[in-house]
Structure formats: C-alpha cells, structure tokens
C-alpha cells in the first residue's frame, strides 16, 4: 500500500520466468526470491496482457483476464487476481505493441501495484503512469521489496520528466489535471532558447501550451522538455471510445462536454466483422453482446457529444463494412502537414507520412484531451534515416521496415520512444502509400512516431483528394532546420534492401526471405495468406496483389487449393480504386476471398484469422505478436510475397513463381 510518500508491498512478487514450470509453481503458491540468473520473458506485448477479446470489457472485469494471453498458456482466468500478487517482474520491452490501456488497467484491477522490467515501452509506460501503476527498471528494488522495506515514491519517479513525476506523485493524470485546471499545480515553463530543430520538435514547439493552459507556442523545445501540447485532431475507435467515455464522465462529471468537438472523430472499424470469426466459447461467454455494446456505446457518445462518426455502410441494400480503417481515413480526409494528431491506437503514427506529428495514446490521455484539448508529452529524441537510391524490382517499403526492425539498435531497445524521421531522395521517390508503411511501422520499433517532410507529392495528393488550395498546403509544411540534432543517423541504400520476412512472434524477427528455408529446415507451407489492414490494405498494396495475381492468371495459375487468400480494403475509397482498376475481377478469378473495409484479421476480429495453433499464415499486417491474429503462427511479409505465397502454397517471392511476373525478373 502507499503510505504518504512511500510504498510498502504487502503482497507477493510474480516473476514472469521463461521457464514455464517455474512460473506454474509460483501460480500454485510458491514464493520465488529474486535471482538475477533466472531468465525472464522479454517482449511481453499488450496483446498478451489483454488479448483482443478481453478488450470488449473496460471495467473491473479486466482483472479476471490479466495476462491470460501470455505465451505458453500458463496463466489462466483469475490467476493474477486471486494469486495475491502486487509486483510483476519481466524482461526487456514490457508492453510492446498496441496502445490499449486495458493492459495496465487489468494489472491494477488485479491488485498489481508495481511493474519492474528491464525496459518498458513508451505508450504502455505513459498509460501506466496515468492510472497510478508504478514502474521501474531498477532490479535492486526487488530485494528491498522482499524484505518488506518502505520504498520512497521517488524511486519510481527518478529519471522522469517533471510532469510525469508529478502525475505519478498525484496518483494519475485525472488527479493531476484537476489540480492543473484549478491552478494548484503548473507544468514547468518551456524556456529552451532558440536552436535548430527537427520537424517533430518544431511541431511540438508550435503547439506548446502555456502554464495558463493557452496554446501560445514556445520559441524552441529540446529533447527531454516536458510540456502539454494542443492537439489539432483527436480520434478513437470502438475498442477505446467507451472506456474513454467512462473515464471522461467519472473524471469531469456526468454532463461534461468534449471541447471543440469539430476536431474529434470516432471510427467503427475494428470489430465490424467480429461475428464471422468469434469462437463458440466466446459466444457462450456472452462476448458477442459485450462486443456489440462497444459500437452502440460509441454511437451514443458521438451523438451526445456532436462528433463525427465514421460508421458502417451499405451497398445495394447490404452491409458493406466500415467507411474505412481510422488510419487510412485520417490520411484521406483529416490530417494536414504540420498538425499534431493523437489517436487511441498505436498506429496513429501512420499519418506522419503527411508531415504531421501523429502518435497513439491510451484511454486516459484521450479522455483528458477531450476536455483540455491538450496532451502531455516529453519531447522525444529523433533518429534520422537517410534513404538513398531506389528499391530493386520486387522490393517495397514493407521490406525496408522489416530490414530496419531487425537491426541491433531496435532489437536492443535503444530506439524506444524515439521519433523516426525518414528523409533522403530515396524516401521522396516513394509514393505516399509506401511512405505510410514506413511511418505506420515506426511503433513496431518501439518508436514514438514516424514522420516524413511533406513535399510536392503530398501537396498534389491533398489537392486532388480534398480539393485544398496548393498554396495553403505548402504554407503548412514543416521542415527540419540545418544543424538539427539527431541522436542517431542511419544511411540506407535502398538498392541493397532485399525481400524480407519476419518470423512468428515479433516484427523484429526479420530475416532475408532467401534464408527462410535454411532457418526453417525446409519450405514453410501456409494455410492462410492475408492482405489487408491499415498497413497492407492501401491502394499501392492493391496494385501489388493485382500484379502478382494477374501474372499468375496469365500462366493459368490460381490460389493454391490448400490456401485461403484474403484481400481486405483499408477504406471504401480504396475499394472503389480497386474496382475502377479492374482488380476485383482479377482477384475473384484468382480465387481471392474479398473482405470489405475493416481492421479484421489484424486484430483477430475478421476473416483471415487462424483457428488452430498448427495453422500458418503469411500476412501483410504490421505485427505478429503471439495470439495477435489467432492461435497459429504468423509470418510478416510484403504484399508481393503474400500474393505469391498464396499461389505457391508456401512462402515464396514472386520471382520464384515460374515464369516470374513482368517487371520482377
């Protein structure tokens, strides 16, 4: 319990050990003492803390399912809640993946007060701080906790920026913001003198909020500065809107109103096709009705608050999916260069392809931003990637990201919380959709976000897509200053990047595709090929699927009888594009199972999910953490490899199909 400014742990410590038998013994009542030689589980994702189906709940019920998705299946319902644990200990990269606040919330609800890990991912850490869950990477605390010592709260604020430290000391973000609005506390003034800044730093400086909660901007900011920044765009989807609404009303009053609702958006995109794949056991648990309630609650919130809801659509009188995945629609309809965009999803960073600063937040951050219009952040360091040359035929941006993610800088955790800025003539030679793949997957590196300076290609896109005036778009463009400081800079020769595949379990498990047979001891046969999601359901992705499948049809080939190939559109605009290009006919003739716009299989909520642990999927989505798209194994690859593998029945590149498609030889 917390007594004044100190914590005394009365409950047990749970070590999430790599040895499943040792973990089972702890769950059965054995007390394990701290031993630095015992291997702990690394890369525990938020999907493992609270699998997608657990997120249909957003109350104390979450306590019953804490860590139920942990690899190996050792932890069962109620095990954490009923185990008397107050401390959970794990290895590196705790809380990677999704921005879902249900993950730390389930820990708190189950009685956990302290999380200790070798390293902790940025969004998970901020969500935990917001709800009063104490975090540390200092393993020397464990013997002290086991001895029953009082641990000063300062041990959990050491190294934090002043705002984060104050939030932790306050017990969470709502308590801090109530004090801030009442004038009882103030964030530190931003007093950094003029200096050369990166794109991200410039956008943050322009959106900085003064101590009086007005958006006056700052002369300059530098990495480490703590501040609140005014958000131009705030959005959420049905997975998070209900939880954010419950927190919003509890924190600010049942009749509280969202400030500037015209800049707030809601999306029905994640669970549109859940009924098609919900396991019988989940139906029997009542989860169908629970999941359906998320959509109806979001509709109620949107109506009551006057915010724009991107909902479901019909075609010829029949259901036709969602208007679009939030990230695709934010690029198509909403975000602009130079803006600050927050969303209730870790892949909000995809909009950075337009030259805006876009990043994911949890439900508590979002609920507070609905009221205050601002979001707290610590100015992140920036890593620069200078892309030179051109990609070889048959290689695309997905391969670039899988190549980058497997590098030591990211695998070691040194990139956690960094901005990934992509630049160089190789970057600007890529079309918007391919740039969006780069920024989308920045979070897979543990990054804060990804960003690319807007250029004439972006100006032309926004003029054509939205009818904006070119001069107005150009006036919004933000560029890094000469002499801006980067914590690291990497030069990438695009011509040297080769087709990649990420082995199951983590998008950072990338290897060159040519090594897959040796790595796996033979061909990797597949049951499912999935092309969709915000990452793999864009217009350029449709071009790639169609190029491979069209060439296959010309050779008299179709999707292998042993494989189901799903192609799912990221939005109705993308579906219309595919139809106008004649791709729908190509897909149907090739044996593709077409799926209307929605997140679908990426979130284990639509056609394309695996149904058993022995099924193997090759997928164009962005992450393959255990359980993410079903119980089977998921390999990540480019749209080209996904389509070719569906034809071959095993993971291959299009050049391995005989004869190879035109332009890929």
Say what each PLM segment does.
Residues 1-665:
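Fe-S-dependent hydro-lyases/dehydratases of central metabolism
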């Amino acid at each position: 319990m917390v007594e004044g400014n100190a914590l005394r742990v009365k409950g047990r410590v749970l070590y999430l050990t790599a040895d499943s038998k040792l973990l089972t013994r702890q769950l059965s009542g054995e007390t394990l003492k701290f031993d630095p030689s015992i291997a702990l589980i690394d890369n525990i994702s938020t999907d493992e803390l609270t699998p997608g189906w657990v997120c249909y709940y957003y109350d104390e019920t979450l306590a019953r399912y804490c860590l139920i998705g942990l690899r190996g299946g050792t932890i069962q319902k109620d095990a954490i809640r009923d185990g008397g644990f107050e401390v959970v200990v794990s290895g590196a990269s705790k809380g990677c993946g999704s921005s879902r606040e249900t993950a730390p919330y389930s820990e708190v609800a189950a009685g956990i007060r302290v999380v200790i890990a070798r390293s902790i991912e940025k969004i998970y850490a901020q969500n935990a701080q917001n709800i009063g869950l104490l975090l540390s990477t200092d393993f020397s605390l464990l013997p002290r906790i086991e001895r029953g010592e009082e641990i000063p709260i300062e041990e959990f604020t050491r190294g934090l920026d002043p705002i984060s430290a104050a939030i932790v000391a306050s017990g969470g973000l709502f308590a801090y913001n109530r004090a801030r609005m009442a004038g009882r506390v103030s964030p530190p003034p931003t007093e950094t003198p003029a200096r050369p800044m990166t794109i991200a730093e410039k956008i943050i400086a322009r959106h900085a909020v003064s101590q009086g909660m007005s958006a006056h901007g700052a002369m300059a900011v530098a990495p480490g500065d703590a501040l609140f920044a005014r958000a131009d765009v705030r959005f959420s989807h049905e997975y998070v809107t209900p939880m954010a609404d419950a927190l919003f009303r509890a924190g600010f009053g049942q009749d509280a109103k969202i400030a500037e609702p015209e800049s707030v958006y809601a999306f029905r995109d994640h669970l549109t096709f859940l009924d098609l794949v919900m396991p019988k056991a989940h139906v029997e648990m009542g989860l169908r009705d629970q999941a359906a309630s998320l959509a109806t609650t979001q509709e109620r919130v949107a109506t009551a608050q006057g915010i724009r809801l991107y909902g479901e659509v019909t075609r010829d009188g029949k259901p036709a999916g969602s208007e679009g995945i939030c990230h695709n629609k934010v690029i198509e309809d909403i975000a602009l260069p130079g803006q600050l965009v927050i969303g209730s999803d870790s892949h909000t960073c995809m909009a950075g392809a337009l030259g805006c600063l876009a990043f994911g937040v949890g439900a508590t951050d979002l609920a507070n931003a609905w009221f205050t219009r601002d979001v707290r952040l610590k100015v992140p360091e920036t890593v620069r990637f200078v892309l030179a040359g051109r990609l070889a035929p048959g290689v695309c941006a997905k391969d670039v990201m899988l190549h980058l993610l497997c590098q030591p800088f990211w695998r070691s955790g040194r990139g956690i919380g960094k901005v990934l800025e992509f630049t160089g003539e190789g970057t600007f030679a890529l079309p918007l959709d391919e740039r969006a793949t780069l920024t989308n997957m920045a979070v897979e590196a543990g990054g804060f976000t990804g960003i690319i300076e807007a250029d004439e290609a972006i100006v032309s896109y926004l003029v054509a897509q939205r009818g904006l005036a070119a001069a107005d778009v150009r006036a919004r463009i933000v560029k890094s200053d000469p002499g801006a400081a980067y914590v690291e800079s990497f030069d990438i020769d695009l011509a040297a990047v080769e087709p990649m595949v990420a082995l199951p379990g983590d998008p950072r498990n990338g290897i060159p595709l040519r090594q897959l047979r040796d790595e796996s001891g033979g061909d990797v046969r597949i049951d499912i090929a999935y092309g969709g999601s915000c990452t793999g359901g864009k217009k350029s992705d449709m071009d790639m699927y169609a190029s491979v499948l069209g060439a296959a049809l010309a050779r008299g080939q179709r999707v292998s009888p042993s494989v189901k190939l799903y192609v799912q559109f990221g939005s109705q605009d993308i579906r219309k594009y595919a139809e106008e290009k004649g791709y729908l006919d190509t897909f149907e003739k090739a044996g593709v199972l077409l799926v209307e716009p929605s997140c679908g299989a990426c979130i284990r909520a639509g056609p394309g999910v695996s149904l058993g642990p022995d099924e193997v999927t090759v997928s164009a989505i962005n992450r393959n953490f255990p359980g993410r798209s079903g119980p089977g194994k998921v390999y990540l690859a480019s749209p080209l490899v996904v389509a070719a593998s569906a034809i071959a029945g095993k993971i291959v590149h299009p050049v391995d199909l005989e004869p190879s498609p035109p332009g890929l030889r």
